[in-house]
């Protein structure tokens, strides 16, 4: 074989997909392939696709079409490949391979087979693989941040969600494996570790016979990483034991990402989340009592089939009452293969859009008020970027998760990828502004 081809990866979708991309990069680099961020210079482009909702599929398809027009050899991986492998091979001649969500660990063999002229379909119908600390990984986040997958797949069957069909049943990693990877990441200079899975509060249920998130957090408390953040916590899994572990483990942030989806029992029942409607209020109250400094992020779906103005009004009241720090709102997207796909009483697009806008308009002053409460405080900020034209630094406090929440704009001297104390001097609806505590002493 002559010179090895150059390969680029285009990552789309969620952070679970990002980790898959990082493992593929790590495997390819270890095998001697050249990796380039510039797709124009690459011989192959791996597009790690998303198929969660219609907008994500459209973005994936647009990317594939653009690369096909550029005559690139395309390897399609991820959820779209798992979902529509036959259609993709039929409609995109430039696709030399499709790779399922449980097959990315074989990427080196797949590329070698395509180099020999084969067109490869590597799709496990029931994905069962989960990467551990021994699989090479080439991180694509900045030096100080890493995502750590504690489990893959999902055993729940929410009516709107296709993910269990695309990523398989839940399979958790042993606590020892997760801690070993966290230690590796700490040695690489990681300052913030974000724990992810489909339902992080269910971690360990398949492996140990009961959820073990509390024990995992306690074990990670011994790792030298200052910030550990939990994403995708199912509300009913926030038991007193888990809340206690969050409270008592110093490097676990009191930040919780809770995908509540709705508040009204009728809609939650239709979503196949019936038990949640009985406990939403109690769990949030219990959280705020046990963790007074807790930062709560949530997401909601508006326009689920059958959602009336009364149901939506219940959601508005719920958001007003609980004063979440951060809220994301999605309009319902009917996904073929899910229980909600052909439900009656569809909500018109314009009504869904109006409800999304009304909910975000309700949340905006709440977010602004939460930020305003930080005025005059000194907050720890992880410095991530520098604006060379202004000399200003950009980072995040513990209140803000990467990419989904706000930023902190910082004046003064600081080092990238370090956590520094910052005095907050101004706020707006979504961001904070300040100067390093050292700079503030000058004034």
UniProtKB/Swiss-Prot annotation:
[4Fe-4S] cluster 1 binds at residues 14, 50, 79. Keywords: 4Fe-4S, Cytoplasm, Iron, Iron-sulfur, Metal-binding, S-adenosyl-L-methionine, Transferase. Pfam families: Radical_SAM, TRAM_2, UPF0004. Binds 2 [4Fe-4S] clusters. One cluster is coordinated with 3 cysteines and an exchangeable S-adenosyl-L-methionine. Its EC number is 2.8.4.4. InterPro entries: Elp3/MiaA/NifB-like_rSAM (IPR006638), Methylthiotransferase (IPR005839), Methylthiotransferase_CS (IPR020612), Methylthiotransferase_N (IPR013848), Methylthiotransferase_N_sf (IPR038135), NA-bd_OB-fold (IPR012340), Ribosomal_uS12_MeSTrfase_RimO (IPR005840), rSAM (IPR007197). Catalyzes the methylthiolation of an aspartic acid residue of ribosomal protein uS12. This is Ribosomal protein uS12 methylthiotransferase RimO. It comes from Synechocystis sp. (strain ATCC 27184 / PCC 6803 / Kazusa).
């Amino acid at each position: 074989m002559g010179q090895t081809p150059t390969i680029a990866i285009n990552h789309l979708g969620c952070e679970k997909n990002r980790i898959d991309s990082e493992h593929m990069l790590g495997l390819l680099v270890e095998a001697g392939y050249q990796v380039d961020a510039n797709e124009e210079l690459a011989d192959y482009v791996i597009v790690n696709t998303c198929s969660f909702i219609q907008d994500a599929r459209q973005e994936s398809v647009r990317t594939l079409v653009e690369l096909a027009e550029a005559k690139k050899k395309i390897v399609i991986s991820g959820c779209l490949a798992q979902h529509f492998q036959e259609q993709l091979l039929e409609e995109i001649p430039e696709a030399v391979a499709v790779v399922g969500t449980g097959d990315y660990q074989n990427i080196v063999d797949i590329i070698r087979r395509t180099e020999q002229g084969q067109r490869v379909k590597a799709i496990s119908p029931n994905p069962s693989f989960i990467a551990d600390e021994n699989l090479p990984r080439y991180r694509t986040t900045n030096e100080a941040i890493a995502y750590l997958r504690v489990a893959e797949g999902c055993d729940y069957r929410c009516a709107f969600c296709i993910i269990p069909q695309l990523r398989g049943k839940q399979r958790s990693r042993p606590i020892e494996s997760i801690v070993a990877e966290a230690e590796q990441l700490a040695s690489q200079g990681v300052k913030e570790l974000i724990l992810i899975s489909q339902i992080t509060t269910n971690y360990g249920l398949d492996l140990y016979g009961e959820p073990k998130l509390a024990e995992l957090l306690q074990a990670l408390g011994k790792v030298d990483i200052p910030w550990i953040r939990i994403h995708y916590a199912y509300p009913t899994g926030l038991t007193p034991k888990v809340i206690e572990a969050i409270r008592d483990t110093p490097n676990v942030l009191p930040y919780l990402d809770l995908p509540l989806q709705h508040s009204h029992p009728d809609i939650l029942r239709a979503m196949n989340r019936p038990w949640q409607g009985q406990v939403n209020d109690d769990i949030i109250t219990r959280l705020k009592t046990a963790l007074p400094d807790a930062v709560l992020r949530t997401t909601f779906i508006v326009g689920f089939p059958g959602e009336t103005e009364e149901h939506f009004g219940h959601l508005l009241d719920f958001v007003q009452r609980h004063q979440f720090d951060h809220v994301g709102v999605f309009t319902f997207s009917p996904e073929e293969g899910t229980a909600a796909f052909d439900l009656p009483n569809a909500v018109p697009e314009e009504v869904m859009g109006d409800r999304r806008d009304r909910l975000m308009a309700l949340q905006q002053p709440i977010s602004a008020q939460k930020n305003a409460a930080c005025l005059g405080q000194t907050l720890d900020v992880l410095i991530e970027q520098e604006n060379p034209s202004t000399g200003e630094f950009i980072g995040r406090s513990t209140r803000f998760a990467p990419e989904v929440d706000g930023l902190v704009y910082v004046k003064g001297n600081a080092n990238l990828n370090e956590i520094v104390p910052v005095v907050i001097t101004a706020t707006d609806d979504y961001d904070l502004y300040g100067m390093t505590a050292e700079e503030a002493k000058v004034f």
